[in-house]
């Protein structure tokens, strides 16, 4: 618990990224540069170079463990932060995790704000890459 709370301020947004992809890495760096927040990345493996990142904390969930373990890990993570005044922002960073989130959205929405497709594209590629009508809508 202390490991998580040291980097989280009351009232802050906590990005929770699913999958270690180039989009996840760029999203974590962008969130850190723009807002000063550390992203929590749930993934199946952690490359050595990524372990040195100052803007990401990793939670390793073996891919062979299946969906239920990932959902349980997310639930436990949210429960650890349950009494804090935080917004847990769940961002799936590949198609597999996007499908997982959509399939279990009802359960996950109790604890997380879930990015929709337009939000994911803005977060992954930056607001400047999204069409103007989507950004201003």
Regions picked out by a protein language model, each given a short descriptive name:
Residues 15-31:
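Glycine-rich adenosine-cofactor-binding loop
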Residues 2-20:
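Nucleotide-activated donor-dependent transferases that construct or modify glycoconjugates
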Residues 14, 37-40, 87:
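Residues at the starts of beta-strands that form the adenosine-phosphate
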Residues 51-137:
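Conserved N-proximal alpha/beta basic substrate-recognition cap immediately N-terminal to
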Residues 42-49:
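Short, polar loop motifs at secondary-structure junctions
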Residues 6-12, 33, 81-85:
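Flexible, charged surface loops at secondary-structure boundaries
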């Amino acid at each position: 618990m202390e490991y998580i709370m040291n980097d989280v301020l009351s009232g802050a947004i906590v990005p929770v990224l699913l999958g270690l992809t180039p989009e996840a890495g760029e999203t974590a760096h962008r969130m850190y540069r723009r807002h000063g927040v550390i992203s929590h990345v749930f993934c199946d493996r952690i490359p050595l170079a990524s372990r040195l990142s100052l803007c990401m904390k990793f939670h390793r969930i073996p891919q062979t463990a299946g969906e239920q373990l990932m959902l349980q890990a997310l639930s436990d993570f949210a429960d650890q932060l349950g009494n804090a005044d935080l917004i847990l922002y769940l961002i799936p960073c590949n198609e597999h995790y996007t499908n997982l989130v959509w399939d279990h959205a009802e359960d996950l929405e109790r604890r997380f704000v879930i990015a929709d497709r337009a939000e994911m594209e803005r977060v992954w590629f930056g607001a400047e890459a999204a069409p103007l009508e989507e950004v201003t809508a």
